[in-house]
């Protein structure tokens, strides 16, 4: 039994190393593709016709998704290897919200989704967190909200303070999540049966790991037909 456990740990470690290595190797060529596409968009190599512009946009969207997946895989390997490095600093919640909006604005415009902000600044304190990681979580949650929303709809991102807890939340008004899956959606690689939205099944799992590494919680409130609300709770 001890031998089997040792072999399992070695295999798991090898898997983590392999995924990390492949993800690093993929980032460079994908980034190069993105840079080349940007040159095309800026018309530095000539003007594109309509068909070429559509093709360029399609390649860029796919490349961006690949880049997101490699980022998710790298984050996952850090968590699994116990090498998650935290660099906390004093951060205003609005800075995290603004980062998430900026990162998702193009996607929101694509589907004509209105992003609404709820932020009573005078009533909210500051956080001592790794701003890069919490911003990543909010960005992922907002991206999901947009992708699961109806076209021409709206999503809400905001913050509020309850005692010594600051809540950062993202809400959509899409189809919602079956209560049976409210816990499972935070599992690695889990995908809600029947969903048509593309994804790796890693984003929410990594988000939960990042939040819990700060001593916080990430939860979901959802009702079928009415949408979903994801809430990050952190100590102020």
Regions found by a protein language model. Name each.
Residues 61-68:
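Short alpha-helical segment of the dimerization/phosphotransfer core of two-component systems
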Residues 203, 207:
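Short alpha-helical Gxxx[C/S/T] motif in the catalytic ATP-binding
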Residues 53, 87-92, 109, 114-125:
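Conserved catalytic submotifs in the C-terminal HATPase_c
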Residues 77-88:
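Helix-loop junction within the histidine kinase core
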């Amino acid at each position: 039994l001890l031998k089997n456990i040792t072999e399992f740990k070695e295999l798991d470690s090898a898997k983590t190393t392999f995924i990390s290595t492949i993800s690093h190797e993929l980032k460079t060529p994908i980034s190069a593709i993105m840079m080349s596409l940007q040159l095309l968009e800026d018309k530095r190599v000539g003007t594109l016709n309509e068909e070429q512009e559509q093709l360029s946009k399609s390649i860029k969207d796919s490349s961006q998704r690949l880049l997101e997946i490699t980022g998710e895989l790298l984050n996952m390997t850090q968590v699994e290897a116990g090498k998650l490095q935290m660099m906390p600093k004093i951060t205003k919640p609005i800075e995290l919200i603004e980062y998430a909006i900026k990162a998702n604005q193009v996607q929101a415009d694509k589907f004509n989704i209105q992003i609404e902000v709820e932020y009573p600044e005078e009533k909210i304190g500051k956080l001592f967190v790794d701003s890069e990681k919490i911003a990543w979580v909010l960005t992922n949650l907002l991206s999901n909200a947009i992708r699961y929303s109806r076209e021409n709809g709206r999503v809400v991102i905001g913050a509020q303070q309850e005692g010594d807890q600051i809540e950062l939340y993202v809400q959509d008004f899409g189809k919602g999540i079956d209560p049976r899956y409210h816990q499972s959606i935070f599992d690695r690689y889990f995908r809600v049966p029947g969903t048509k939205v593309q994804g790796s099944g890693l984003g929410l799992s990594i988000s939960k790991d990042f939040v819990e590494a700060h001593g916080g919680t990430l939860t979901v409130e959802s009702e079928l037909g009415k949408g979903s609300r994801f809430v990050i709770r952190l100590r102020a």
